[in-house]
């Protein structure tokens, strides 16, 4: 089912969260206010939150955070779990075709909805359009899945946002952590449309047809391997990012005072990333 498109972290303070990502060496897109359905109102309205993104050559990382606390916040239940990763998106060429295929496997996804957002493209305001299929939160305790059709991808993947001080170039993998591995595996197999391949390390890996990976880790094995696990399970627990030069990326982070664990895997701890494990691809 498509390709790994992006992962989204949600934090209580967008400014503080953005500063952490910038310290890691990610260049972030401008602040974009969020709006949508409001309780007790028929028309859409402004939310308490906004987002900024680290746009990579392949995929991106989204940061959602509170900017106006007095307004309605649709992300409260996620923040009540923890600050960290709560969104995992797969990209497809046609949302209607994807929904038809997914509906043959499960009834836990909502029909595609049209979305639009205005943004600056080389000094001209353009309307970015996309269609989202959202998972139903009650069926997916680990977080929210989005199956996404980009209708104007050129407005999101602007070259000026793809040159990062740390040399980040691609989103390679999402790391999922669960105590009930069989149940989590079943949910992922249903979404991806293909079985997992279990490695010699016990990690179950899903490979969406269009690219990227989703890794499923058992909770205790994840904690033993990384020295940390999310405060609530199941959860989206980490990301793997590829850099043009891993050594230079790590040095950039260390020069900014961020420790990089260099062992079999190169890692940055959740305290520096907004609540998830960052793995630097070899």
Positions of predicted regions on the chain:
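Glyoxalase I/VOC metalloenzyme domain signal
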Residues: 1-5, 9-29, 45-115, 120-282
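A short beta-strand-loop structural module common to alpha/beta enzyme folds
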Residues: 29-36
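N-terminal beta-loop-helix "entrance" segment that forms/cooperates
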Residues: 38-43
């Amino acid at each position: 089912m498509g390709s790994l498109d992006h992962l989204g972290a949600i934090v209580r303070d967008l400014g503080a969260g953005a500063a952490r990502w910038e310290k890691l060496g990610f260049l972030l897109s401008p602040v974009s206010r969020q709006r949508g359905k409001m309780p007790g109102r028929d028309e859409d309205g402004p939310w308490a939150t906004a987002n900024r993104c680290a746009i990579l050559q392949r995929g991106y990382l989204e940061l959602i955070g509170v900017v106006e606390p007095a307004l309605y916040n649709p992300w409260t239940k996620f923040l009540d779990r923890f600050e960290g990763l709560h969104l995992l998106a797969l990209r497809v060429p046609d949302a209607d075709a994807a929904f038809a295929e997914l509906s043959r496997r499960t009834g836990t996804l909502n029909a595609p909805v049209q979305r639009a957002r205005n943004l600056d493209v080389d000094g001209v305001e353009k309307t970015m359009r996309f269609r989202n299929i959202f998972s139903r939160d009650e069926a997916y305790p680990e977080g929210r899945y989005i199956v996404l059709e980009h209708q104007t991808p050129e407005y999101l993947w602007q070259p000026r946002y793809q040159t990062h001080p740390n040399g980040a170039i691609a989103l390679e993998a999402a790391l999922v952590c669960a105590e009930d591995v069989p149940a989590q595996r079943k949910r992922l197999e249903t979404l991806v449309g293909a079985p997992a391949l279990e490695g010699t390390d016990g990690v179950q890996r899903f490979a969406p047809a269009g690219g990227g990976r989703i890794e499923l880790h058992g909770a205790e094995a994840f904690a033993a391997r990384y020295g940390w696990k999310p405060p609530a399970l199941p959860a989206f627990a980490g990301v793997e990012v590829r850099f043009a030069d891993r050594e230079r990326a790590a040095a950039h982070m260390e020069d900014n005072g961020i420790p990089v664990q260099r062992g079999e895997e190169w890692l940055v701890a959740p305290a520096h990333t907004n609540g998830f494990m960052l793995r630097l691809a070899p």
